[in-house]
Amino acid sequence: VCGTLMARSKAISGGPVYLSDAPGDFIKENIFPLIDKQGKLFRPEAPAVPMPESILTNPLWSGKAYRVAAPSGNGAMTLICYNLNVSPRHQQVQATIKKEDYSLRNSFEKMSATPEERVLLYNWKSQKAEELSDSSTFELIGFTDKLFHLCPIRKGWAVIGVQEKYLSPSTVQTISLTENRLVLNVLCTGTLKVWIENSGKQELRSISIDTPQKIVIEK
């Protein structure tokens, strides 16, 4: 895996990952976020595809951000925004994520989303979350990428997943969900991130997972 940008691209692609470097050159910080303890890849529910505005663009010369997305677990959609421009004039580009982007889950087989569904926008690197009521705009400086998860907010819960893995939503399975209780099957160790709304308050809760297990979370 060549760098963090390539590692995240491999994660969202849904394809195999080949470690072609010499073993002494492996960077575990880029590899471990792709896999569980047994080396099994966390994969999206379908391979990533370019967002509509990126399909017919040349990401090296467009002067714009290049965006790709894939459906991940628990109704979430994982999205990566890239600045792949090689021209010095476009070392800084602007990217926008809109709530309507989440509705593109409809285009994936057996996936569905409704326009009125509330969506949480989670920035994987900064570990910050906010409800995406309209849109969020940010800068991409240099040859770089930013990884986001768009997670549905249902009954005051949004399941993000294990932070240490690129495809966080793919690391958990929702067993049941009510207004006050959430039951999850967590597939790997790490820090589980869950968005919780209760009595008008919002909380991004971090839960330490020492072993893969079924857990019950109360508001």
Feature locations, PLM:
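C-terminal beta-strand-rich structural cap/linker in extracellular carbohydrate-active enzymes
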Residues: E131-Q173, L192-V194, E203-K219
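Short proline/glycine-enriched turn/loop motifs at strand-loop junctions of beta-rich domains
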Residues: A113-E117, L187-L192, N198-Q202
